[in-house]
Structure formats: C-alpha cells, structure tokens
UniProtKB/Swiss-Prot annotation:
It comes from Equus caballus (Horse). The lineage of its organism: Eukaryota, Metazoa, Chordata, Craniata, Vertebrata. Residues 1-26 form the signal peptide. GO terms for molecular function: endothelin receptor activity. A lipid is attached at residues 403-404, 406 (S-palmitoyl cysteine). It is found in: Cell membrane. It is a multi-pass membrane protein. Its main location: membrane. The keyword Membrane applies. This is Endothelin receptor type B. The chain crosses the membrane at residues 103-127, 139-164, 177-198, 220-244, 273-297, 326-351, 364-390. The gene is EDNRB. Residues 128-138, 199-219, 298-325, 391-443 are cytoplasmic. The modification Phosphotyrosine is found at residue 440. Glycans are attached at residue 60.
C-alpha cells in the first residue's frame, strides 16, 4: 500500500497543473487584445499607443498587442515553445492614467504652446529688427529660439493628441516627420548651448576682442554646422519609426512607434541603445562642456583680474552678464530635461516584465514620462523668460517689442523700429559701459 500516497501526489500535481493551464487559457480568451507587451518594445512605444482611462485587469503594459488576435497553441509545439508564448503573470490592479491628469496635461501643454510661440517669436524679432543686438552670442540664441519654435509648433500638439486619442490619423509621412523634427530641434538646442559656452570662454580668454555689431564669420559657420549635424543625427528617427496595426479590445488601431524589428543591423543597434545615446549626447554632453569651459573661464578671470587695466573693468562686467545668462540657460535645460531622461533610464534598469509588481512601477513611469515631456516642452518656452529676467538689455527690448505688437499697424514706423532698442539701451548702465570700452579700444 506504500505506492498509494505517491500515486495520490502525482494525481494532485496533475490536477494543479491542469487548473493552471486552464486558468491561463481562460485569461487569454477573456482579454485577448491587451494581454502582453512584446519584449522588444522600448519605453517611448509605451508613450505612443493610446492610453485609456484604465486598462483591463491582467494586462502587463500600457500598449495593445501588436499582432492579430491570439491563437491557441498547437499540440505539436514543444514545451519550450509553450513556455515562451505564455504571457507574464497578470497585474493585480489596472494600469491607468486618470482623466484628471489628462486634463491637467492638456492645459499645461496649451499654456506652454502659447507662451513658447509668443516668447520665441518676440526674441527672433528683437534680434532681426535691431542691428545693435546682432552679435555672436545673440545669433546663437536666435538659432536656439528657432529650434525651440519648431519643437513647439510640431511636437506639442501631437503629444497632446496621443494622450487623448486612440488612433494615429496623420499617415506614415507624419509618423516619420514628427520624431525627426523633435530630435533635430533637441540637437539644435544642445549644440547651441555648447557653442555658447565655448564662445563665453573665448570672449574671456581674449580680452583684446571687443564685442561689436554684426555676425562673426566663425559664428555663422558654427550655426551652419549645428543645424547640419542636428539634422544628420535625427535621420535614424525618420528611418526607424513606422506605422503598426495593433489589435486593441477587438478593434485594429494604427500606431506610430519605433518599429520593434528593424531591417538593418545598425538600426537594430540604434533601437536597443537609443535611450542611452539620448541620455549621453543630448543631456550629459552640454552639461559636461558647460562645466568644463566655465571652470576654465573662472580660472582665467581670477588669473587676469589683477593685471587688467581699469578701462576694461566695465567691459568685463558685460561679459560676466552674458556668461551668467548662458549659465542660466544651461541650468534651465538640465532641470527641464532631467525627468524625461530619468524615466527612460529607470525603465531600462528597473522594469522587468516578469515581475509580479511591475504594474505599479509601469504606472509610475508612464506618468513620469508625460511629466518629463511637459518639462522638456517647457524648456522651449522658458528660455525667453530666463533672458528677460537675467539680461537688462533683453528685458528692455522685450518691453519695446511687446508694446509695439500691442499698438495698431498705423502707429508703427520703421524709424522707431530701428531706434527703439538703442533708446532703451542708452538709459541702461550696461550700454554706457559698452560705449566707454569701445572708446578706449579706439583710442
């Protein structure tokens, strides 16, 4: 009678396994559309698909299945193949983005959109209309504002739509164009900040170089290189993004995302290393260059301060003001882009789709991603505000330009447009310093 317990144990184990298989198959029949996320999907693909108010219980990600409705495993498959097709354990609670967050996100995005267009357009008009503002640093700031304006006009409306809507109605051309413009505008911002930091060090290191009116040839070359390099680095985005048809709750949706399977080895490598590449080049690089050249600039100031002539002290104050402005722009950039890069790095380091507690982390990362997108968009509209607060010259010119836009068209005269900035700056102590330094250099 000794084999009886062993036989009963085997029967009990068989019943448990049968119940488990039946439960898994029942779950698959009940929630076929949003059952599992393909393991190749990156974190920004979590962003691109529709984000409903709540996802069905048992879903392990915020994206629908990128395939046809699931089929039952065939009897001829091996045990290893069946284990690979089984989905991860279901979530204990739903993954959701509440309607309140959607409304707040929409309001914030609209506010950033309006402020960004007004601020960057005003900044470009100030530099274009007034010859006294056309110098090397200001032309780089104008390039920065133009890149921000492209980001605001193209990306912010699309990001708001992706959060509120389900389908992608814009076609494959816009699917490739939007991420291309986004990466190009970010590249323009990053490289412009790097060029500004290097330019400030060169201005302090060469005390004999007096700032004048006009665009230096080297600055023009820098701007051309910045735009060309930014466009070239954004080409993989246009190549990798594509339209995918996804099965979601019984209906097929068109989704724009970085395709899970790329055609070339380079694009597959780019897809796997994309988030680390964005973090290192588009975030760490400008911070490292700014820290390096501002350290050299500080050492140069301390070394030459005692030996400078008194007449150059006022000119030094002007360069310090410009350096402070550039430093504020870099600091604002770091604070605005940190949440977005942090969410993507956390996704790569902490998220495990086989973890039973992954759903809470995924909900947190999804919300953090949208907060990061809003903060990154905020960087595009906050640069003119930072210039208004830090620089007296930009503040006076902003006041003049906004007042001119509030007046009627008949009251505008070309002579006032050309001389108003100079009138404001004539009352500014910084302009007197600049004029005295020019007199000293001419003598």
């Amino acid at each position: 009678m000794q084999p009886l317990p062993t036989l009963c144990g085997r029967v009990l184990v068989a019943l448990i396994l049968a119940c488990g298989v039946a439960g898994v198959q029942g779950e698959e029949r009940r929630f076929p559309p949003a059952r599992a996320t393909p393991p190749l999907l990156g974190f920004e693909e979590i962003m691109t698909p529709p984000t409903k108010t709540s996802w069905p219980t048992g879903s392990n990600a915020s994206v629908p299945r990128l395939s046809a409705p699931p089929q039952m495993p065939k009897a001829g498959r091996t045990a290893g193949a069946q284990r690979r097709t089984l989905p991860p354990p279901p979530c204990e609670r739903t993954i959701e983005i509440k309607e309140t967050f959607k409304y707040i996100n929409t309001v914030v995005s609209c506010l950033v959109f309006v402020l960004g267009i007004i601020g960057n357009s005003t900044l470009l008009r100030i530099i274009y209309k007034n010859k006294c503002m056309r110098n090397g640093p200001n032309i780089l700031i104008a390039s920065l504002a133009l890149g921000d304006l492209l980001h605001i006009i193209i990306d912010i409306p699309i990001n708001v739509y992706k959060l509120l809507a389900e389908d992608w109605p814009f076609g494959v051309e816009m699917c490739k164009l939007v991420p291309f413009i986004q990466k190009a505008s970010v590249g323009i911002t990053v490289l412009s900040l790097c060029a500004l930091s290097i330019d400030r060090y060169r201005a302090v290191a060469s005390w004999s170089r007096i700032k004048g009116i006009g665009v230096p040839k080297w600055t023009a070359v820098e701007i051309v290189l910045i735009w060309v390099v930014s466009v070239v680095l954004a080409v993989p985005e246009a190549v990798g993004f594509d339209m995918i048809t996804a099965d979601y709750k019984g209906s097929y949706l068109r989704i724009c995302l970085l395709h899970p399977t790329q055609k070339t080895a380079f694009m597959q490598f780019y897809k796997n290393a994309k988030d680390w590449w964005l973090f290192s080049f588009y975030f760490c690089l400008p911070l490292a260059i700014t820290a390096f050249f501002y350290t050299l600039e500080t050492c140069e100031m301390l070394r030459k301060k005692s030996g400078m002539q008194i007449a150059l002290n006022d000119h030094l104050k002007q360069r310090r003001e410009v350096a402070k402005t550039v430093f504020c722009l870099v600091l604002v950039f770091a604070l605005c882009w940190l949440p977005l890069h942090l969410s993507r790095i956390l996704k790569h380091t902490l998220y495990d789709q086989n973890d039973p507690h992954r759903c809470e982390l995924l909900s947190f990362l999804l919300v953090l991603e949208y907060i990061g997108i809003n903060m990154a968009s905020l960087n595009s509209c906050i640069n003119p505000i930072a210039l208004y607060l830090v620089s007296k010259r930009f503040k006076n010119c902003f006041k003049w330009c906004l007042c001119c836009w509030c007046q009627s068209f008949e009251e505008k005269q070309s002579l006032e447009d050309k001389q108003s900035c100079l009138k404001f700056k004539a009352n500014d102590h910084g302009y007197d310093n600049f004029r005295s330094s020019n007199k000293y250099s001419s003598s």
